[in-house]
Regions:
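Thiotemplate assembly-line natural product biosynthesis machinery
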Residues: 25-32
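Catalytic cores of DNA base-excision repair glycosylases
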Residues: 14-20, 32-214
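RNA-binding accessory domains that recognize and position tRNA/RNA substrates
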Residues: 8-13
Length: 215
């Protein structure tokens, strides 16, 4: 059985909202997202392969830059199998200009894992997705929630900025060990019916917030 340790937020001095306020927050946030979300090509897809490609590209690269690369990459490598079998020269050509080439090499290794360990089918559980090379907790949460509608948080810097503001959290979001605090908060807040949209809504909201709360 796959388990993750639950954090007691009270030990960190964080008091979460009562349930009715959480439900109201979810509703308001998702209404805002429905009205204001950006029309991005990967948001038109629930295909886990498409979501994965977009999330890896977005790790070190601006959204507007990623769009043409994303569309070309899927044109060249439309399936996990085609990525797994791609010649390295063509793979690197598809990535040229994005930099951080280890990202695309890890993606090919992960695609090969999917072919051998998952019979060519993209894993549909958080633990399965997390087992793939180059996929950390954030990316696993994004794919799980967006593609498979699993209530898994996707906690990036933008999300941590929003939570720090909402709950007056003074823990430095730049310290990796503090990520678990925000992860635990998101496990309570996330909308169970629309977890993917909830994660993306918080990311969009956080991208408008320039800095975390000052300690």
């Amino acid at each position: 059985c796959y388990t993750r340790d639950m954090l007691d937020l009270k030990e960190y001095g964080i008091v979460m909202w009562p349930e009715e306020k959480i439900i109201s927050f979810r509703e308001k946030l998702l209404n805002w997202y429905d009205e204001n979300k950006r029309d991005l090509p990967w948001r038109r897809s629930k295909n886990p392969y498409h979501i994965w490609v977009s999330e890896i590209m977005l790790q070190q690269t601006r959204v507007d830059t990623v769009i043409p690369y994303y569309e070309r990459f899927l044109d060249w490598f439309p399936t996990v199998e085609s990525l797994a079998n791609a010649p390295e020269e063509r793979l690197l050509k598809a990535w040229e200009g994005l930099g951080y080439y280890s990202r695309v090499r890890n993606m090919q290794s992960a695609a090969q894992q999917i072919m051998t360990d998952f019979e060519g089918k993209f894993p549909n559980t958080y633990e399965g997705i997390s087992s793939l090379k180059g996929i950390g907790p954030y990316t696993a949460g994004a794919i799980s929630s967006i593609a498979f509608n699993l209530p898994e948080p996707a906690v990036d810097g933008n999300v941590m900025r929003v939570l720090a503001r909402l709950f007056e959290v003074n823990y430095d979001i730049g310290v990796p060990s503090n990520r678990k605090i925000f992860q635990a908060m998101m496990e309570i807040l996330i909308d169970p019916k629309r977890p993917g949209d909830f994660n993306q809504a918080l990311m969009d909201l956080g991208s408008d917030i320039e800095a975390p709360v000052n300690p």
